[in-house]
A protein has these predicted regions:
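DNA-contacting interfaces and partner/effector-binding or oligomerization modules
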Residues: 45, 52, 57-76, 81-176
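N-terminal, positively charged regions that mediate nucleic acid binding
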Residues: 1-40, 44-54, 58
Length: 176
């Protein structure tokens, strides 16, 4: 088991953190997943438990008409990958509204959900499960958030700055 897998397991099984800050934690998972819009709400992960947690947190908080689909497939290097998606457009709009977004995508990040440092840490923990990797500190300490949109990256930079965590922004080739 890799160091990143151990960290993700520790976070995803921290029931106290999740229960106290469920909305902020969920917001981090959903906003920083693969997609968060009226057209598509989804995430992919190699961790089955994280995929189940993503779907569970949606159902626990938001009244849904249809379903959230979790698919298992062989990804890169024959690694099992789980894709979770919200199937119905009305359900996606309901989820967006729950987190203070509109269906047109005018509001990309809702900073109101991150009112204090505990909510910010919960958001970062959720985001970590959806889009991050961390290297073993015994070798080379490096934490990476891979975010889809510039506004989400701006929110992440603001949060890290407010929490006095050092970071640097880099744009991967071909991702401009």
């Amino acid at each position: 088991m890799t160091f990143a897998t151990k960290v993700k397991s520790e976070i995803s099984h921290n029931k106290g953190l999740i229960a106290r800050n469920k909305k902020a934690f969920s917001y981090g998972m959903l906003l920083c997943g693969k997609s968060f819009s009226a057209q598509n709400i989804s995430m992919t992960t190699e961790n089955k438990y994280i995929a189940k947690l993503y779907a569970k947190l949606i159902f626990q908080q938001i009244p849904m008409q249809t379903s959230v689909t979790t698919r298992e497939y062989n990804g890169n290097f024959q690694q099992t990958t789980y894709a979770v998606s919200v199937d119905d457009e009305e359900d996606r709009k309901t989820i967006l509204a729950f987190f203070g977004h509109d269906a047109q995508g005018d509001k990309v990040c809702n900073a109101e959900l991150l009112e204090d440092s505990e909510h910010c840490y919960a958001f970062l923990a959720g985001a970590f499960l959806s889009c991050s990797n961390i290297s073993d500190p015994q070798k080379d300490y490096h934490l990476e958030f891979v975010l889809a949109g510039e506004q989400t990256a701006q929110l992440m930079m603001r949060l890290l700055n407010e929490l006095q965590l050092n970071f640097k922004l880099s744009v991967r080739r071909g991702q401009q």
